[in-house]
């Protein structure tokens, strides 16, 4: 609980700066809308020209301030990277929250696929190990050694990790299972070849 509390101030500062940035961007958008209306209904009078120049300068100042805030090395926003796909969603008039939802769903599907693959390889390993021990008792120690080395159970720490880390761990486990399953197949083929040659 202590680590969570220590990270709260940074998160609160980030959310606060994001809120300020959101207000600045909203003000800039509203000002440009007002500027567009002024240009459309521009009467051509000196007063209207002065008001348009003032509005334009205000927009430039707001954009300049926004740029300064985004490039401030002391700002918590300096490490925030917006994916180009999100920008494209906004340009296309789509809700950027859809990108987040689709990304999370893609990670979840990939994680489930890797877990199912690991589980399937584990079942294949156990079944193959039992058959090899039945047919070739002299390989029992080697088979049990391989099964023990590839019997990687997720720890409690792995369960509380994020989906991306969990997916990476699962992929690594799957690779180990694939490699060791190949070892079992090689040992079985070697033994079968030896028996066929009468050695």
Curated annotation (Swiss-Prot):
GO terms for molecular function: transcription coregulator activity. Transmembrane segments: none annotated. The keyword Nucleus applies. One of its GO terms (cellular component) is mediator complex. InterPro entries: Mediator_Med10 (IPR019145). Component of the Mediator complex, a coactivator involved in the regulated transcription of nearly all RNA polymerase II-dependent genes. Mediator functions as a bridge to convey information from gene-specific regulatory proteins to the basal RNA polymerase II transcription machinery. Mediator is recruited to promoters by direct interactions with regulatory proteins and serves as a scaffold for the assembly of a functional preinitiation complex with RNA polymerase II and the general transcription factors. Component of the Mediator complex. Belongs to the Mediator complex subunit 10 family. This is Mediator of RNA polymerase II transcription subunit 10. The lineage of its organism: Eukaryota, Fungi, Dikarya, Ascomycota, Saccharomycotina. The gene is NUT2.
């Amino acid at each position: 609980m202590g680590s969570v509390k220590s990270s709260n101030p940074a998160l609160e500062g980030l959310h606060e700066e994001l809120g300020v940035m959101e207000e600045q961007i909203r003000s800039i958008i509203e000002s440009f809308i007002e500027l567009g209306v002024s240009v459309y209904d521009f009467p051509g009078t000196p007063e209207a020209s002065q008001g348009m120049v003032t509005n334009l300068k205000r927009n430039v100042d707001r954009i300049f301030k926004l740029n300064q805030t985004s490039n401030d090395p002391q700002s918590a926003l300096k490490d925030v990277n917006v994916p180009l796909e999100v920008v494209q969603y906004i340009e296309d008039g789509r809700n950027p929250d859809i990108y987040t939802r689709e990304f999370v769903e893609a990670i979840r599907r990939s994680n489930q696929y890797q877990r199912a693959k690991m589980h399937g390889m584990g079942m294949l390993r156990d079944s193959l190990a039992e058959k090899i021990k039945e047919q070739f008792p002299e390989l029992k120690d080697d088979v049990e050694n391989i099964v023990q080395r590839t019997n990687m159970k997720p720890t409690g720490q792995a369960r509380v990790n994020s989906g991306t880390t969990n997916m990476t761990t699962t992929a690594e486990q799957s690779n180990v299972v694939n490699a060791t399953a190949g070892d079992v197949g090689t040992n079985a083929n070697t033994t079968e070849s030896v028996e066929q040659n009468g050695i």
